[in-house]
Amino acid sequence: MAETQNFDKVNILKRRSIPYDEYFGDMDLTPKQKAKRKEMAIILEDVFYIFFEMFGKGLEIGFLNELKVKQELTYQLYDAIENSKEAERFFETEEQKDKYITDTVNETYRSTVENIVREPDTLDYTGTEKYWLSGDRAQFIAENESNTLLNSAEFIEAKEEGYTHKIWMSYGDDRVRLTHQEVDGAKIPIGAYFDVGRARMLYPKDVTSELSTGAECPEEVCNCRCTVSYVK
């Protein structure tokens, strides 16, 4: 689910996204893991920007075809995910994939409408684009969703390779949420859930696993930079 939307707050002329090399580069990940996240984020950024362009054109002509723009975003997300090199590892079941895409489409549309109505004049950091339909927002969503998908893929891969435990690792700076600091260093069985604030997650940004409550707790998921180390 595009959990970034529920936590989508911005100040006028303040950049919300972070350049991919910086966003992923500072995480406790291998160079290969960082490269995969950046590659997927670039693809997803185009997907969300196409959606914003369609949305904006609908507003310009005074007719926003909800069904059409949702169908296009759905198609683009399926295409991006299914053509990824990691496609087979993003989700454990087809049902998980379908739910993730449906939730992402519905939440992206809902939040865009809601924010445009509430704050129609909010600009992006360049002062030239309406933030809610901007490249900045597309990048912000893309970097978050890429991290969500690759975290899931790495969890599934770790299980397949026989890892038995996992350790939650926070980013370690003064921006880390208190609830994430509290779970930092916790080592649990690979199939167990971390309790992070109100959220129950298998790994950082888990919004798709069967018993996860991450999708209902955007304050624990949005822009999370934590990682997990898998051990045997």
What residue ranges belong to the model's regions?
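N-terminal leader/targeting and assembly helices and adjacent pre-domain segments
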Residues: 1-157, 161-162, 213-216, 229-232
